[in-house]
UniProtKB/Swiss-Prot annotation:
The keyword Cell inner membrane applies. The gene is dedA. Keywords: Cell inner membrane, Cell membrane, Membrane, Transmembrane, Transmembrane helix, Virulence. Changing R133A: Unable to complement deletion mutant. Coiled coil: none annotated. This is DedA family protein. Belongs to the DedA family. It is found in: Cell inner membrane; Membrane. Residues 1-24, 94-160, 209-219 are cytoplasmic. It comes from Klebsiella pneumoniae subsp. pneumoniae (strain HS11286). It is a multi-pass membrane protein. Residues 46-72, 182-187 are extracellular.
């Protein structure tokens, strides 16, 4: 429970925690951000990490004159982390996907996560790799499912690069451009919650549609 409470606190107060990391570790924060983003996109056991809000807050902090963070270097490193993470995830799914999800009682490798991602694939096809970047949990499992389904790596790699660029550039530069505005600084926590809700909403809608479609077929 302590870990769960820590994760919830980290996500909801990511602006405070990230500022503390910058103050404590200086330039090493680039490596920390790289590792967090790589884990969220590259490891199916960490779909809960806050990629969207992390990118936005990192961009916002780099806009403040009190920090020495270079937003352009950060964007470059985050794009690389996202691309490499998805590539690793694809490889894991291709080699070990069926074995990892063979246990229906697993608390980590839940079939519901796969079902959620499959519904995205049914609707959007290969473009899921791009669109999933903007949907928490789905973005972690999309490359994994692509690997399980033996999607052509050439096609996957193209979608992977495009998706990583769009995702990282949008959220990081949005934070950089608007993060130092007084109205944003004063309501940053509410904005973080809004980003999380808006990110999760498409996935929730997709699940509802999928369940309704399954119910109609059952009838």
């Amino acid at each position: 429970m302590d870990l769960i409470h820590f994760l919830i606190d980290f996500i909801l107060h990511i602006d405070v925690h990230l500022a503390e990391l910058v103050a404590q570790y200086g330039v090493w924060v680039y490596a920390i951000l790289f590792l967090i983003l790589f884990c969220e996109t590259g490891l199916v056991v960490t779909p809960f990490l806050p990629g969207d809000s992390l990118l936005f807050v990192a961009g916002a902090l780099s806009a403040l004159p009190t920090n020495d963070l270079n937003v352009h270097l950060m964007v470059l490193l985050m794009v690389i982390a996202a691309i490499v993470g998805d590539a690793v995830n694809y490889t894991i799914g291709r080699l070990f996907g069926e074995k990892l999800f063979s246990n229906p009682n697993s608390k980590i490798f839940r079939r519901s996560y796969l079902d959620k991602t499959h519904s995205f694939y049914e609707r959007h096809g290969g473009k899921t790799i791009i669109l999933a970047r903007f949907v928490p949990i789905v973005r972690t499992f999309a490359p994994f499912v692509a690997g399980m389904g033996h999607m052509s790596y050439r096609h996957f790699a193209a979608y992977n690069v495009v998706g990583a660029l769009l995702w990282v550039l949008l959220f990081t530069y949005a934070g950089y451009l608007f993060g130092d505005l007084p109205v944003v600084q004063e309501n940053l926590k509410l904005l973080i919650v809004a980003i999380i809700v808006l990110s999760v909403l498409p996935g929730v809608i997709e699940i509802i549609r999928h369940k309704r479609a399954a119910a109609k077929q059952a009838k």
